[in-house]
Amino acid sequence: MKSKVQKKFFKTTPIALALIVSGYTAAPHAIEFNWGDVEGSFNSQITAGSSWRVEDSDAKNAGVGNGGLPGNTPTGDDGNLNYAKGDAFTQTIKGLHDLGLTYETEEGITFGAFVRGKYWYDYALDKNDVIHGSGTNNYVANQPINNDDFNNLTKSKGVALLDAYIFTGFYLGETAVDLRIGKQVVNWGESSFIQGGINAVNPVDAAAFRRPGAEVKEGLLPVNMIFANVGLTDNLSIEAFYQLEFEPTVIDSCGTYFSTADYLAEGCNTLVVDPNTGLTDKGLYDAGIYATRGTDEMASNDGQFGVAFKYYAESLNATEFGLYYMNYHSRLPYASAEAGLANTLVPGQGYTYGQAISSPFVPVGTDLSGLGTTAEQYNSNYHTVYPEDIQLFGLSFNTTVSEWAVSGEVSHRLDLPLQINGADLLASALTGDPDSPLTPQYKEAAAGSTVDGFDRFDYTQSQLTFIKFFDKALGTDRITAVAELGYGHVWDLPEGDDDIKYGRATVYGKSFDGIGDDDDGFTTSDSAGYRLAVKADYRNVFAGVDLAPSVAWSHDVYGYSPEPQGTFQEGRTGVNLALKANYLNMYSMSVSYTQFGGDFNPLSDRDYVSVAVGISF
């Protein structure tokens, strides 16, 4: 028989909670079939939807040459400037299909396979003109974004295989064993909303989550791995995985609505550099004041593995405890630079870009004098790095207290990379700003060598989650309430005025130029925030129609977490108001409004509304 851990009484995984909050209902009209002794099911979801911007852009979120505030840089504002209030930034039709097959022998051994795939087409991304342009089309305005070189999952149209694995379940004596091999998702830990905890096995597809009517299963990227779950005793089980490949998180592509970096995503190979010229992105590009992307440093396919022990303590209020260890490579990219090649120029003499003959981005005839730059800087380029071998240790629990489901976790990472402030990094590597604390290490680096744009620190994060169901309350069939609190701490982080600064979106400028805000928004030792969500279910309101209004609220109260994850950013807020209608558990329609806030949140002026309709069968 299955161990108590494997058939546990209550378990709210991140996916399960997301389904609760979103109002998702598994398709009851799935096609079920038998092929001899093989049982199968085929599920389909077709969705069409659109999203529109409902707020004007704010000058605080744009580079100074693009109409932004003094001190702001032009390296993270393309997505903001491309869409005016009222513009549709996505108009998508998509399909999601999965096939499951199961076969059980007379001895009770189970074999099976599961495959899931999706396809999509986004008319707005493919055909709609944008106002500002991006580096992918040389900042030519009033034409569609060129997404030809984007990651396949962020393009305007595509087909993708998600899950694809085989599995088996059997007994070794009294020991239950489950094995899965192939592209799959593994969920660990107890976090429901707050990122940066134990649940770090799989990367995320940000573009999928941006599309109207998104499901959690569309946005978690399966990875080829071997996974095993073994019931060691009636109360103790062990889980383990070994990944067979490295897959990065898919971030928002440059120029698209939610992008906050114009140069990091795949296919975004141009970085305009503004050495205090005040030019627009188009002006900088036409003047040749831009850097090109070098060769990205992808992580190895080897060395990612983890093990978890789950113990079910029935005598301790039926509590499950978890103990975790994982070694993984960063799913998120870190900006770094390559030290330039020296030219034989006389110090202190004015030069034109044309004299820096090996520069990849300088036009002939532009005077370099007074910019405080050297030939070495103008031979630099930038690229992204995926740092390897981050070790994670974790503890978790979940139980019930009165009628509340209560869970929590603590995770500790050894050698977590912290992104150096991007504006400081780029100013040092590409313009040689003499005031930057980073410039000396670029000047001292060997020509052609990589100077990492990150330093490593240990990081601890803890979270508590509370879930409560209120049945037949306030005229509803059920109200679901969720609250989650989180706190993070970076160990031994230097925070002096002259120390290197970490984090903060590049659009908000450098930490040392005395223009704009030099002091706030950078990574701090401590940070905290909370998330709240409430959903009401009204069943069969009329003629088989179910209604599910919901509200979700997020608030980062204190401090700034390590970037690029950026779990907590002081003052950052978000609210989502939604109403979903479901007819006969087959047809659905949803309407939502999302609002952002925060002083150092580049999305703070990108409120939007979404509408989606779908069919499940």
Language model feature labels by segment:
Residues 48-54, 119-123, 127, 183-187, ...:
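Transmembrane beta-strands of outer-membrane beta-barrel pores
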Residues 605-617:
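Outer-membrane beta-barrel "beta-signal"
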Residues 42-44, 113-115, 179-181, 228, ...:
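Membrane-embedded beta-strand positions of outer-membrane beta-barrel proteins
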Residues 107-262, 529, 558-559, 568-573, ...:
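Outer membrane beta-barrel
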Residues 29-42, 55-57, 99-113, 167-179, ...:
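Short loop/turn motifs that connect adjacent beta-strands in outer-membrane beta-barrel proteins
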Residues 33-75, 113-117:
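Transmembrane beta-strand segments of Gram-negative outer membrane beta-barrel proteins
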Residues 90-92, 326-328, 333, 407, ...:
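Detector for outer-membrane/organellar transmembrane beta-barrel domains
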